[in-house]
Amino acid sequence: MRLCDRDIIQWLDEGKLVIEPRPPVERINGATADVRLGNQFRVFQGHTAAYIDLSGPKNEVNEALERVMSDEIVLPEGEAFYLHPGELALAVTLESVTLPDNVVGWLDGRSSLARLGLMVHVTAHRIDPGWHGHIVLEFFNSGKLPLALRPGMVIGALSFEPMSGSADRPYNRRQDAKYKNQQGAVGSRISED
């Protein structure tokens, strides 16, 4: 069962759930709290590698990822990031989120953006119990026109689902957690699997 808006507000008030900066009450509706787009992005430079062998030796995977992933792009205030048709880019939420050990979060893109071809969180929309940090967004433009994305715009909504108990291995206590305390548009760390 997911938390309703009243419970989200109560959990934020009690510090059981942390979203910084905290969304205003008008951005907490039904069963979700809105999240906004941050100003950090990364793009893929596909022309620098023919392919990435995801099951290859770790050093080769790392080398390929370093060739295809751009440095972090930090947009100045008021600037837009343009995502062209068929492009994949990483971005980050403006908000940092901290979940307790007994709650799993779910991030969904906005329907209004999907109707324009924007996929906000391509496949990985689960936020693990014990998570702390910004959420990296995997953008894909499946539409026909470039999309201008501006930091601060509402990009998605988080819902929160209490579990049957506390996780024995929440994300913040796992030694193998690749994205623990994530800040910025962190690229794939698939080679650490």
UniProtKB/Swiss-Prot annotation:
Gene Ontology MF terms = dCTP deaminase activity; nucleotide binding
Look up the coiled coil feature and give its residue ranges.
none
Q: Pathway, per Swiss-Prot/TrEMBL?
A: Pyrimidine metabolism; dUMP biosynthesis; dUMP from dCTP (dUTP route): step 1/2
- List ligand-binding residues for dCTP: R110, S111, S112, L113, A114, R115, D128, V136, L137, E138, Y171, K178, Q182
Location of the active site: E138 (proton donor/acceptor)
Which Gene3D superfamilies does the record cross-reference, listed alphabetically? 2.70.40.10
Q: Mention one GO biological process in which this protein takes part, according to its record.
A: dUTP biosynthetic process
Which EC number applies?
A: 3.5.4.13
Pfam families in alphabetical order? DCD
Q: Which InterPro entries match?
A: dCTP_deaminase (IPR011962), dUTPase-like_sf (IPR036157), dUTPase_trimeric (IPR033704)
What spans are recorded as compositionally biased (Basic and acidic residues)? Answer: 170-179
Q: Which UniProt keywords apply?
A: Hydrolase, Nucleotide metabolism, Nucleotide-binding
Family named by the database record: Belongs to the dCTP deaminase family.
The UniProt subunit note reads as follows: Homotrimer.
For this protein, the record's NCBIfam families field holds:
dCTP_deam (TIGR02274)
| HAMAP family assigned | dCTP_deaminase (MF_00146)
Q: What does this protein do?
A: Catalyzes the deamination of dCTP to dUTP.
- Protein's name in the database: dCTP deaminase
Q: Which organism is it from?
A: Proteus mirabilis (strain HI4320)
